[in-house]
Regions:
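Charged, low-complexity intrinsically disordered terminal segments
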Residues: 1-109, 113-146, 150-523
């Protein structure tokens, strides 16, 4: 598949991947990665919770101990500055804080060790934020990649870095270690995105001589390649101080609000460059590796799928039809169905994906979908207009189920809702199990930030890994993926059917229906 799409394909070992099973372990794993880092820390998230001072203290302590350590952080500008500028209320003396003010304390305390970059979707006029509010403008597009790493290890996830994601919000997390090439790829990706983002600069203290230990006033400075980040990608794909692969940018800096076309060209060049690095690495492996059947049986592959609609980067939407076609061929050839599992905390399938699911022949594979029940939606019980979002997803879910019924696919397409008392559901992913390994488990999975909806396809910056388990089907990774699917399905206890939508609490008002249709491209 990587060859057909012109994408890099990384060879690794299944024994160097581990699924993390709970939010609390996810937090501990991130802390440990930061504490172990000797040379670099790289973090990419939608935002970091403004109260995550313990996590920032871990990073600050590690930076203090290791002056040679460098860190790069990439977050979304709109989401991270939603609360406004850092200030201290003159009456209550309480500070007004945000993700940006939290991270600004990093650049204030470690200006020679830390870069913080805030991505803001191209083409959005600043006056629009003031007219309708940042939270509404966020629907136009966000930096959504979730990558948390240090040195040659990292966690690929769909979770952000805030309290709910560390306690009672179900997501997915895969820890990769001893991965120098993949780690270089990811940090290079973050650095590249940093060059068409804003640099976060700590501003003058709010009150002379009175700096907040965990927050700072800040300013945003457009990069556009005008400034040199602390780290850069070298010609051989390694990342170090002084490495820089933006020569084209230096000749013509990116424009602040009109960078999408040029940034897209840079991402395409990045992808081709890394495809070449992977080919060279594989050739070196084949030339030097003594034949080892045990090692070959443990070989797994990772294909990063970048989806950046505003930049016209469409790896995921290009790959999805090929994934479904591969399952179709295997299922029909085996004369017995395979299985495709799909889950999203925000179930609003991109129209082409919806068609792929509905058009798939029942004799080739069955599809099992897990979505969040309304009370498991992260917006359930919120204030303001966002309180209607769970019912908007209910309406889109009902429309999908009606389409399943019109196709007569109720027996081959199963839709369940996930419910766990006191928890919300944020997991997203796809697993597919061909007929030959039906008893053993999935041979492939998609793990990352994409929710497979309209937003993921068209508006946000997404990075999702297509992971290929060893082809023997006997790999520990295959068994672990099967266990992961079963664990997620354990709380998927609400079957979606006509009886469910007939319940009073599932009746969607006409106002929400109309609004859902109008804004579904932003959900």
């Amino acid at each position: 598949m990587a060859d057909g799409l012109g994408l890099p394909r990384f060879r690794t070992r299944a024994s160097r991947m581990q699924l993390i099973k709970s939010p609390t372990r996810f937090y501990k794993a991130i802390e440990s990665i930061i504490e172990r880092a000797q040379e670099r820390v790289f973090l990419s998230s939608l935002y970091i919770g403004k109260d995550e001072t313990d996590l920032m203290d871990t990073l600050k302590t590690t930076l203090s101990k290791r002056p040679a350590l460098r860190a790069i952080v990439l977050v979304d500008a709109l989401r991270s500055t939603r609360e406004g500028q850092f200030r201290i209320d003159p009456v209550t003396r309480r500070p007004n804080t945000s993700c940006a003010s939290l991270l600004a304390s990093l650049t204030r305390d470690f200006p020679d060790q830390v870069d913080v970059c805030l991505y803001r979707t191209s083409g959005l006029p600043v006056w629009l934020e003031k007219l309708i509010g940042k939270r509404v403008v966020e629907g136009a597009g966000l930096q959504h990649m979730k990558i948390y790493g240090g040195d040659n290890e990292f966690i690929m996830s769909g979770a952000n870095l805030s309290h709910d994601y560390f306690s009672n919000r179900q997501d997915r997390y895969v820890h990769f270690w001893d991965q120098p090439l993949l780690s270089n790829y990811l940090i290079s990706l973050i650095l590249l995105c940093g060059h068409f983002s804003y640099r976060l600069m700590a501003a003058k203290a709010v009150e002379a001589g009175k700096e907040h230990p965990h927050h700072s006033a800040y300013a945003l400075q457009w990069d556009g390649s005008n400034s040199q980040l602390l780290l850069g990608e070298a010609d051989d794909g390694t990342v170090n101080e002084g490495g820089c692969h933006i020569a084209a940018l230096e000749r013509q800096p990116l424009r602040e609000h009109k960078f999408a076309f040029d940034a897209g060209k840079l991402v395409n060049a990045f992808t081709q460059r890394w495809r070449q690095h992977c080919e060279e690495e594989l050739a070196n492996y084949n030339n030097t590796q003594v034949t080892n059947d045990e090692d070959d049986d443990n070989a797994a592959f990772v294909v990063p799928l970048l989806q950046m609609g505003p930049l016209n980067i469409t790896n995921e939407t290009d790959a999805m039809p090929r994934i479904f076609e591969a399952l179709r061929r295997e299922g029909l050839a085996a004369d017995m169905p395979g299985c495709l599992d799909l889950t999203s905390g925000y179930f609003s399938l991109h129209s082409p994906y919806k068609s792929l699911v509905l058009d798939a022949p029942s004799e080739a594979f069955e599809t099992r979908i897990v979505a969040a029940a309304p009370e498991s939606n992260g917006f359930f019980g919120s204030k303001g207009i966002s309180r209607h979002i769970p019912m908007a997803y209910t309406w889109l879910e009902q429309k999908f189920w009606k389409a399943v019924q019109r196709r007569g696919k109720e027996r081959s397409i199963e839709l369940l809702e996930w419910v766990k008392s006191g928890w919300t559901y944020h997991a997203k992913g796809i697993w597919w199990t061909p007929p030959r390994t039906r008893a053993l488990g999935p041979t492939h999975t998609l793990i990352g930030s994409s929710n497979f909806g309209y937003r993921s396809a068209l508006r946000d910056l997404e990075c999702t890994f297509l992971v290929e388990a060893p082809q023997s089907g006997q790999s520990c990774l295959t068994h672990v993926l099967k266990e992961e699917v079963n664990d997620l399905r354990h709380n998927a206890t609400v079957p979606v059917n006509d009886a469910l939508f007939a319940q009073d609490d599932r009746k969607v008002s006409w106002g929400v229906r109309i609004a859902a249709e109008l804004i579904k491209g932003r959900l």
